[in-house]
């Protein structure tokens, strides 16, 4: 009897230990079930597609029926997927109105799995939950469009590049190309991640594999669109004007877009602990380059342009909290870190180059 009670007690302790170990995974699953229900509820209320969604549906019809594209400058991937579904089910926008939500939900799962492996379950859940409940992301993911689709391939690219397997880097190249096919200008974001990871790994063979995979997909997309439309255009002319005078639009509206969490981003960028872990570098570059790119547009500023780099914003926000908890905020150490970093860069530059009497730098 005593032995049975001991075994039961031990078994109960093991169950509790497992529940404690996987508590954030359980919370994540519960959160995701709630999220899926919210998507289902809001999508079921839609009676007509938004303007952009209507044209993606028209383009899908044109691809399916071999007619000229209504708007040939729109990225083709979402229309190809819809056309593929319609070839089986018949044409009905109701069948595909929840399509983008599937990609957004999948992006969150991939993000959680990646961050859980490298940063822990609590960190992963925090970043993923903040990303998934982001207002712009949720709203546009309930529509027929490309925001969630492009986010999915950006996150999937990040996932593949964080692995050192050659096959994963080739797949990363393909997902970069699919990001291009999803939403043309968003290709910049996985490219930035790719460049950062390439500099960290320093493995030319992996880089070449990624480039080959990327070119394979991009050339296929360009050729197919060109053969269909007789031309290839990535955007309207009015949306392609850029300037070095960066607009403050996204910074001014940052609290409306990302909430109070955005206030933590500068802390993460300035804190020296952020730069100890090379895993963070891709997220830093992802955020900075994306923000500067969209701020450099001379006229077209939209909240939905921030969706694809929202994970980077919340990653840095949560990282700032982690830095404060573990190291605190020490202004002197932060200033010293940046002072030493700048001095180190200047010294390495001076060692590499010499200034000749003619006023030119030379090696």
Feature locations, PLM:
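Extracytoplasmic catalytic/substrate-binding loops of multi-pass membrane glycan-assembly enzymes
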Residues: 44-57, 69-81, 91-94, 232
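Membrane-lumen/periplasm interface segments of specific transmembrane helices
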Residues: 37-38, 55, 206-268, 289-293, ...
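Short acidic/glycine- and proline-prone juxtamembrane loop motifs at membrane-interface regions
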Residues: 136-147, 302
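Transmembrane-helix motifs of polytopic, lipid-linked glycan transferases
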Residues: 98-118, 156
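Loop-to-helix entry region of an early transmembrane alpha helix in multi-pass inner-membrane enzymes
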Residues: 76-80, 90-106, 140, 303
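Hydrophobic, aromatic-rich transmembrane alpha-helices
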Residues: 194-198, 256-280, 284-288, 333
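Perimembrane helix-loop-helix junctions
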Residues: 10, 163, 188-215, 241-242, ...
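Transmembrane alpha-helix segments characteristic
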Residues: 25, 29-33, 131, 176, ...
